[in-house]
UniProtKB/Swiss-Prot annotation:
Keywords: Ribonucleoprotein, Ribosomal protein, RNA-binding, rRNA-binding
Protein name (database record): Large ribosomal subunit protein bL25
Keyword Acetylation: no
GO cellular component: cytosolic large ribosomal subunit
Known function: This is one of the proteins that binds to the 5S RNA in the ribosome where it forms part of the central protuberance.
Keyword Transcription regulation in annotation: no
Subunit structure, interactors included: Part of the 50S ribosomal subunit; part of the 5S rRNA/L5/L18/L25 subcomplex. Contacts the 5S rRNA. Binds to the 5S rRNA independently of L5 and L18.
Protein family (similarity comment): Belongs to the bacterial ribosomal protein bL25 family. CTC subfamily.
Recorded GO MF terms: 5S rRNA binding; structural constituent of ribosome
Organism: Leptothrix cholodnii (strain ATCC 51168 / LMG 8142 / SP-6)
Amino acid sequence: MKFVAFARELQGTGASRRLRHGGKVPGIVYGGSGKPTSIELDHNALYHALKKEAFHSSILEMELAGQSEKVVLRALQMHAFKQLVLHVDFQRVDETTRIKKKVPLHFVNEAESQAVKLDKCLINHVVSELEIECLAEKLPEFLTVDLGGLSKGQSLHVDDLKLEASIKVVTHGRKNPVVATVVPIVEEEVIVAAPVEAPAKGKGKGKK
């Protein structure tokens, strides 16, 4: 994916605030052989790009001052309650750069699995993304998780995933975490309330 950035001359809180009022987003690009560079981007173009999954988990081509650089999205700051991007960080990469990045999981063949088709169970997606470590040029936009082999009582773990040899899942000390697990469908028990008898009417008192 490609996007355009512009060099940012003025810095500081006041300058960033004025940029945002003008429909721009302040940011920075760092890493590689170049120096950290303050940049600005068009807010609307960036906001719509951020809606695309690939913008978060793939190598991007940034055009800056007539030059093209390969970068990855590193950090993103959003407004607490408004749909506004406040700041964005990018890291320069090349074919020798080894990076750690979270990538989304795409689950496939769930409906065709024995767990769903025959055992009438549900498959719970325990995680929706995984952090991986690999060379930047090998960074996948997503990881495919095949659920077709699951049956009742089974779970799918990180070690069960079919990944390229160059890709390593970062588990942060957790041993073979669960990615998806089969759970039975629990039918709610309908409780029928016993009828309540109305109390007998007492005899009314006559008028004196």
